[in-house]
Amino acid sequence: NVNQIYISKGKNFLLFFDVGSPPRKEISSGYQAGPLSFEYFIDNYKIITNCGFGNKISKKAEFISRLTPAQTTLCLNDSSVVRFERNNLINSSFGTSIISSFKVFDFNTDENKSSLTVSAKHDAYKNSFNCVHKREIKIDKKNGNLMGTDNLISVNSNSFFINNYSIRFHLYPGINAVQTMD
């Protein structure tokens, strides 16, 4: 677990899983809002990726690449899990820092001879949408197959404020995908 990124390397796979809460505001200028996002390699080929950091393209691309929809994670109502500072004076001194936060918790691993399962939760949507996001990723060690589930857990069963959601898996450029009936 390096800098709150869980890393697991198997015979034919490599997994990076973001299980860290956001940094303090003072040191958050490079934070990308992708709680429970992950990157996955199989047979040394990167398959699933985040969008990267667009700082070599433009300031706008850099900002957009930090939002939740640019990460391989669940996104509710096309919103980002954190709000970013909009004050130009603060941004010119400290970079674009975050002004809201959340916690990642209940990180678990279960590994045996045939599979690896990792899971965690975050409460970034608790105040806005009354729910906690739980992600579980399971890797079959024999063939490298990756399976996962995302759950939204209501904090208060009386209200649930979600209009739409998306779960994005950004494929590495050059990777082709085919939809199956499974």
Task: Name each region found by the language model.
Residues 178-182:
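Short, intrinsically disordered, charge-balanced linker/junction segments flanking boundaries
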Residues 1-167, 171-175:
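Catalytic and substrate-binding regions of extracellular carbohydrate-active enzymes
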